């Protein structure tokens, strides 16, 4: 299972709310892309609503902050905007709210898991 209030728990819960499949344990945030590939899911750099958005260890999260150097980060795409940016929902102990929401402008720089 996933630790309380962490990004992985939120991604699991949100995809469940959306009636989208997600494995019971995909690893740490940065691991979701490789785990999904191993399970036969498509992983690429094209966002779509409901996709798990994967941030590598230490990767900039839209220029706002940096994903954890040990665990990385994972979020869920809520909307793809006309300008190519994405609105994401995310969890993690560093946020004041659970979930938190933010817009990422350089959406093509990240990996997306398409279940």
Segments predicted by a language model, with ranges:
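Aromatic- and glycine-rich peptidoglycan recognition patches
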Residues: 78-115
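Secreted/periplasmic proteins that engage bacterial cell-wall peptidoglycan
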Residues: 1-82, 89-90
